[in-house]
């Protein structure tokens, strides 16, 4: 009889262990500040519960990046000709902010990335990419325009000129990629010996409107969301070259509002957000060949501009700008399904979430 009950007991213990898996960390949140937000917030994330810990004043810090040692947080200032990059001292153990500094450069940067000892910004209105040096003290300074573009696309409203929306370093750290929503292309910059130089251009279908992209954990595939087409493209990455291999619909309403995209930590699922109508997050399962298949859709509050998956993959947290709320979803690792937990944190115009790891 002991052998009969041993397997169920082990299964019950394993299930209980899964339920008790703990995730406690600190998040930081960037915002738009026209409607009363203070700037950048630190938030305690405790097994799906959210509590504001601290904040620091900033003007439209709409995208954030963290130094490797988490001692500094960098944020764009998306403010027309007054744009640039903030550097905030930060204590990752407590979630408290210290001194802040500002370096001017760019026109409405909407994204930034750390590339070695530089910070690179994607300037939406300027149609350009800027770079800032990171000093020995961790402070961003000496900003300059690295490359400017003047392309266009078939959408007479959204694609009159180039709009650089996102920059990301490839997994092998040999290239920096920059999406141009206005000209339907991805620029590839060679990264070598501390220099970043334009190398090649991948032209996409007219009207695709490339916005954000993310690589699979193994670095073999890249997933690109088209804000204007409402599609997600799978690209193969090999020896510095991106090759499109498949496209799948993300926004069935075709309202030209697709937003953010992220891959689960295990690489089995891809999530992409839609805005402007039928707001929500599309769930895709990843096939063996890296292509995607649609397995679900989860409604969200209005305008999920940005979202993040928790480090252990148990939760997805969405920043819903127009409803001034951050919402938490439990994530089933086996099926990819998202389920609202009921946890909501009211915050004015949240638009960027990052975990402090």
Predicted regions located by residue number:
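Bacterial Sec-dependent N-terminal signal peptides
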Residues: 1-25
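Short loop/turn segments immediately following the C-termini of beta-strands
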Residues: 32-34, 78-80, 124-126, 134, ...
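Beta-rich, blade/repeat-based domains predominating
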Residues: 36, 58-68, 105-116, 150-173, ...
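Short loop/turn segments immediately following beta-strands, especially the blade-tip
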Residues: 43-48, 88-95, 132-141, 189-195, ...
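A short beta-strand motif characteristic of beta-propeller blades
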Residues: 51-57, 98-103, 145, 151-158, ...
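Asp-box/WD-like beta-propeller blade repeats and closely related beta-sheet repeat scaffolds
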Residues: 95-166
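Loop/turn-rich, solvent-exposed surfaces of beta-rich toroidal or solenoidal domains
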Residues: 257-321
């Amino acid at each position: 009889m002991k052998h009969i009950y041993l397997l169920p007991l082990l299964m019950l213990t394993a299930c209980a262990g899964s339920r008790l898996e703990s995730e406690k960390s600190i998040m930081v949140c960037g915002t738009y500040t026209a409607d009363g937000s203070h700037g950048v917030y630190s938030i305690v994330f405790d097994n799906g519960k959210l509590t504001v810990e601290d904040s620091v004043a900033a003007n439209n810090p709409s995208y954030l990046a963290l130094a490797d040692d988490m001692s500094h947080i960098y944020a764009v200032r998306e403010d027309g000709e007054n744009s640039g990059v903030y550097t905030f001292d930060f204590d990752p153990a407590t979630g408290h902010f210290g001194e802040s500094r500002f370096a001017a450069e760019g026109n409405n940067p909407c994204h930034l990335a750390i590339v070695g000892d530089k910070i690179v910004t994607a300037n939406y209105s300027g149609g350009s990419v800027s770079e800032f040096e990171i000093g020995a003290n961790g402070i961003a300074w000496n900003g300059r325009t690295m490359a400017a573009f003047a392309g266009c696309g078939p959408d007479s409203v959204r694609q009159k000129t180039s709009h650089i929306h996102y920059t990301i370093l490839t997994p092998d750290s040999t290239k920096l990629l920059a999406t141009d929503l206005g000209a339907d292309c991805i620029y590839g910059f060679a990264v070598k010996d501390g220099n970043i130089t334009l190398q090649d251009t991948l032209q996409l279908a007219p009207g695709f409107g490339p916005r954000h992209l993310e690589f699979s954990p193994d670095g073999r595939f890249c997933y690109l969301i088209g804000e204007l087409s409402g599609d997600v493209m799978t690209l193969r990455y090999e020896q510095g070259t991106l090759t499109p291999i498949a496209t799948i619909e993300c926004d069935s309403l075709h309202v030209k509002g697709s937003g953010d995209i992220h891959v689960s930590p295990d690489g089995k699922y891809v999530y992409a957000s839609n805005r402007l109508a039928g707001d929500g997050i599309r769930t895709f399962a990843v096939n063996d060949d890296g292509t995607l298949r649609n397995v679900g859709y989860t409604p969200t509050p209005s305008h999920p501009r940005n979202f993040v998956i928790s480090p252990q993959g148990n939760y997805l947290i969405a920043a819903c700008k127009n409803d001034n709320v951050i919402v938490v979803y439990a994530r089933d690792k086996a099926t990819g399904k998202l389920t609202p937990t009921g946890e909501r944190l009211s915050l004015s115009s949240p638009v960027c979430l990052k975990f402090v790891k």
